Amino acid sequence: MAKKKSTKRKKSTRNPEAAERNKRIAIVSSLVVLAGAVFVAGAMGVAELDRAAASSIVSGTPEVVIHWDTLSDGSVWMPRQEQERLNLAIARAVQGGRALSAEPLKEAVLTLQSSGWVRGVPEARWTSEGQIVLDAAWRVPAAAVRVGSREVIIDWDRYVLPLDYAIGQSNQYYFTNTDAPLPQTGQQWVGTDLQDGITLLRELSKNDLLEQVAGFDLGSGADSGVISIITKRGTRIVWGGGPGRERPGEKNTSVKLDRMRVLYERAGLIDGGVPYVDLRGKDIMIDSNPGG
């Protein structure tokens, strides 16, 4: 068997400058590799977080919390049935929405905004518990307008609310003989006659003269815009043009209010205890037998 031939290595001459240069290159290369490894690991961690977050965003029916408007005692004034109707409509609108996404918020806002109950655009937000919270500027019922056999509820700006009742069942001051026809829910009832009527309603309220009032007749035909106050006794007090919009020969609002106070002080009734009173002229006109 032939023996392997042994060879001797020649010792190389070591260059100190080259060795130092190679050392620096090795250190820099190590740092670059380490940074790359950290970057990749970090990227993988972010991706895992994204996947974990995405897995928690699932389709479903988020719980909706509506901040209702309240009275001074903290109680909600909106009828329970109407609260339930709105809750159901909004729950249907957001059903199947992805939690923490914008789409359910948009649907909730659009549904509440189109209900006729709010002014402007409602605000919606997600809570950390996955609930949708809704805040809005609510339209408050002010009166009813009689249309046919129904009483349609309006707010103080004459916007039609999604409520109507049989005649005498609304528990609101009513208006009859409006010039303009009934608009759609959520739209404003136009016409200076109804505007004047609401203004008079405010004036009587500020002067504590509403207790015996049932409603207002806005006049028709030649007397359109001539407002008459209808008392709970069924008597009539002719007021005239709206406050600040008096017709020629009419006394102003302060005089008419003073006359109502005088009648109340004498008889304990704002109509003075008679069926017909006219507040417009130089003197109070009283008719004890208007049908005679």
Language model features by range: what are they?
Residues 74-89:
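Histidine-centered catalytic/metal-coordination loop motif
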